Structure formats: C-alpha cells, structure tokens
Amino acid sequence: MANTTSAKKATRKIARRTAVNKSRRTQMRGSVRLVEAAILKGDRAAAVEAMKQAEPQLMRAAQRSIIHKNTASRKVSRLVAQIAKLAQ
C-alpha cells in the first residue's frame, strides 16, 4: 500500500496506463486474428485488407512499448509471408 501522496498518485497513473495498454493490446490482437482467419479461409483479398489494418496497429503498439519492436516486426513478417503463400 502506498504511503506518500506521490506514491498514491503513481499508483493511480499506473492503473490508468494499464487500462489503456490492455485496450490497445486487445485491439491489436483482434486485428491479427482477422488476418489469420482470412489466411485460414484462403481468402487472399480479405487477408490483404485485414493486414492493412493490422500492420499499423502492431507498429503503433511497438512504438508505445506495449510489445517489443522486434516482436511486432516478426509478426508482420510472418503474416506477410503467409499471405504471399496464398498467391501461389
């Protein structure tokens, strides 16, 4: 339990940031799931459209330290590779 005023304020700030980060992480995961679902269906057009939404969200999450930059890049790379396989 926080004793000082500044520690109490820090606790409130952390709670707010956690809520925001959880929301952003949930949105990011949802957009990635849409891409993965389109890939599983074999619908390349839908996968490309979903990827246009997912990539900026992944990179924004990395920029805001919700996920690591390399993790975001790896996810984007793997999804793009899977979409490219659909074209063959």
From Swiss-Prot:
Q: What job does this protein perform?
A: Binds directly to 16S ribosomal RNA.
Protein's UniProt name: Small ribosomal subunit protein bS20
A Gene Ontology biological process noted in the UniProt record is: translation
Which family does the similarity line name? Belongs to the bacterial ribosomal protein bS20 family.
Organism, by scientific name, is Afipia carboxidovorans (strain ATCC 49405 / DSM 1227 / KCTC 32145 / OM5)
GO-annotated molecular function: small ribosomal subunit rRNA binding; structural constituent of ribosome
Gene3D superfamilies on file: Ribosomal protein S20 (1.20.58.110)
What are the protein's UniProt keywords? Ribonucleoprotein, Ribosomal protein, RNA-binding, rRNA-binding
Would you tell me the Gene Ontology cellular component terms?
Answer: cytosol; small ribosomal subunit
Listed disulfide bonds for this chain?
Answer: none
Entry keyword annotation includes ATP-binding = no
Q: Which InterPro entries match?
A: Ribosomal_bS20, Ribosomal_bS20_sf
